[in-house]
Amino acid sequence: MRLPGSEKVIVGYDLGSRYAQISCYVAGSGEEIRTLSSVAGSQVFTIPLALSKRQGVNQWFYGSEAVRYAQEEEGILVENLLKLARDGEPVQIDGTALDPVALLTLFLKRSLGLLSQVTNAEKIGALMITCEELDSRMLEVLAAATAGLHLKTEQICFQSHVESFYYYNLYQPEELWRHKTVLCEYAEHSIRTYCMECNRHTTPVVAYMEEREFPFPVPESDEKMLEIATSLCGNQIVSSVYLIGEAFSQEWMKESLRYLCHGRRVFQGNNLFSKGACYSMMELSLIHI
């Protein structure tokens, strides 16, 4: 649905190490937060964090199109954009040294073009970018990258995945976070977990968060996943479990999934962090929602 020109959009942008995701809320619409598909007419929410350049020509592609073009047309593929920007070393592409932060800005700009599904980037009223860790160097990189977007708003903020998980939880029905809430994120060689528990007897409610990382050397190991699940949920009340990452699957999670589903609500998806960033920005922004 196209929007009347006066309405602003609040954007939650999850900037991961390999993928990005974008969720948005149309201020004043009363609609739910929407996660943008990277492929028209589909439910593909993950955007590969990659660019590719056509050799000899200043023509760039991003996301899955960048990967495809590099494979089929011998384009120059540039991945790990966030790491490259953080490291700060010039990137040699097609005989030219390029600023890695400028490459990240290009990716952000192109991917925000997905807002054309509901509006356009000029209607961004507030932007929250969330990433795994947020130290001083990452803040410096994100500030520089977003400055290059020249958005018509000063409401640009950054937060960690932990904070996005917190805000996502607060906007869910209370029965899902009445007791402990567990998030498991499938990383490359590990399972990263966040456990949140709220003390509802305080005003305001105080949330306790614990981060852990479990080695996961053998991909799709049901036995190892069951061991992790038992460590996280054993001998305590857990209201809900979120499995983040496309690698989680019922095909290999037999006993571990059966254990997790026993007396708990279990959800699988990929857009929790971008939605949490959007919920957070809805609270922080000066836009009437």
Residue ranges of model-derived segments:
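Gly/Thr-rich phosphate-binding beta-strand-loop-beta motif of the actin/hexokinase/Hsp70
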Residues: R2-I33, L170-V206
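A short acidic (Asp/Glu
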Residues: I22-S23, R137-A143, Y167-Y171, I191-M196, ...
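Conserved phosphate-binding loops in N-terminal lobes of ATP-dependent enzymes
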Residues: S37-T130, R212-L226, S231, V238
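Glycine-rich phosphate-binding loops at beta-strand->alpha-helix junctions
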Residues: L127-L139, T230-L257
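ATP/nucleotide-binding catalytic cores
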Residues: L142-H150, Y167, P173, H179-L183, ...
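Conserved phosphate-binding/catalytic loops in two-lobed NTP-binding clefts
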Residues: H150-S164, E255-G276
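Short, flexible helix-coil linker/hinge segments at the edges of structured domains or between repeats
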Residues: L151-L170, E175-L176, S190-E223
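Conserved small/polar residues in nucleotide/adenosyl-binding loops
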Residues: I287-I289
